């Protein structure tokens, strides 16, 4: 049938037109048929790429139309949404054919680009339809913790610093496929990145990290604030930082004034 054909029970009539041929007389034959409407999804949102943190809500919408009948909106039909193949809800289409759903991203949701499936199972006179989109990027906060520093280094000496960085569900930093994400912790002392050198700082399985910091020979004695920071190189983690304090010692010398040596 052509676009614009109304779905439902129809009568198909085949007719040989009278006097259309000198060899045949006119006749006709009728047969009952049922025309199913063809459906599709339009106006899917979000259309453009968005980033959503775990624990936050994301709004999704689509419009169910009858493509075989001039794309008329279909109201009152159930549409199911699936997040990475897992159903998250079934909602009816409104008067304009839109199916709107709000989904709270669980903290167990895998990170990265997520495929969302939109499904209409069909009805007694409408064929089913499905569509999918991959415009939602799931992201996690990170929490960085520094262990207490008990060392009291002298200028020119080395001390150790350690801690842990985790995602918002307590796991270490992982790739989308669940493998370890290569990452480093960066440091500054008293707001400066000079006066010391760092070795290590690699994030390991479970988010644990440690580093050795070598102070320069002229590093001043006193109380210091050290900051550890994670700056992500991927778009499915947010960065984080933390600070703690430690004391350093300097050198002293005694000069003889009297008697002169």
What is the role of each PLM region?
Residues 32-38, 135-140, 244-250:
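Interdomain boundary/hinge segments at the C-termini of tandem beta-sandwich modules
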Residues 1, 16, 53-70, 101, ...:
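Beta-strand-rich structural segments
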Residues 9-12, 64-87, 114, 167-196:
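Short flexible loop/turn segments that cap and initiate beta-strands
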Residues 37-47, 140-148, 251-259:
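Proline-enriched interdomain boundary motifs that mark the N-terminal boundary
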Residues 4, 8-28, 66, 83, ...:
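Enriched for extracellular/lumenal, surface-exposed ectodomains of secreted and cell-surface proteins
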Residues 1, 95-102, 201-213:
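Aromatic sugar-binding surface patches on proteins
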Residues 6-8, 53-54, 75, 95, ...:
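Surface-exposed loops/turns
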């Amino acid at each position: 049938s052509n676009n614009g054909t109304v779905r439902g029970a129809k009568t198909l009539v085949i007719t040989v037109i009278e006097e259309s041929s000198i060899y045949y007389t006119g006749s006709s034959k009728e047969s009952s048929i049922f025309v199913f409407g063809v459906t599709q999804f339009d106006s899917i949102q979000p259309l453009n790429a968005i980033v959503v943190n775990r624990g936050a809500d994301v709004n999704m919408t689509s419009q169910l139309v009858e493509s075989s009948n001039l794309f008329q909106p279909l109201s009152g039909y159930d549409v199911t949404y699936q997040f990475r193949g897992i159903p998250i809800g079934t909602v009816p289409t409104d008067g304009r054919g839109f199916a709107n759903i709000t989904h709270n991203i669980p903290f167990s949701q895998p990170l990265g680009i997520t495929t969302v499936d939109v499904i209409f199972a069909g009805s007694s006179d409408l064929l089913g339809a499905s569509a999918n989109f991959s415009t939602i990027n799931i992201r996690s906060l990170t929490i960085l913790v520094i262990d207490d520093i008990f060392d009291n280094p002298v200028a020119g000496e080395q001390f150790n610093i350690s801690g842990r960085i985790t995602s918002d569900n307590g796991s270490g930093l992982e790739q989308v496929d669940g493998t370890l994400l290569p990452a480093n912790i960066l440091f500054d002392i008293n707001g400066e990145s000079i006066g010391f050198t760092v070795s290590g700082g690699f994030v390991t399985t479970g988010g644990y990290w440690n580093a050795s910091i070598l102070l320069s020979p002229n590093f001043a004695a006193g109380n210091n604030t050290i900051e550890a920071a994670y700056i992500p190189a991927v778009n499915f983690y947010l960065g984080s930082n933390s600070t703690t304090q430690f004391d350093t010692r300097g050198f002293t010398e005694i000069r003889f004034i009297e008697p002169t040596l």
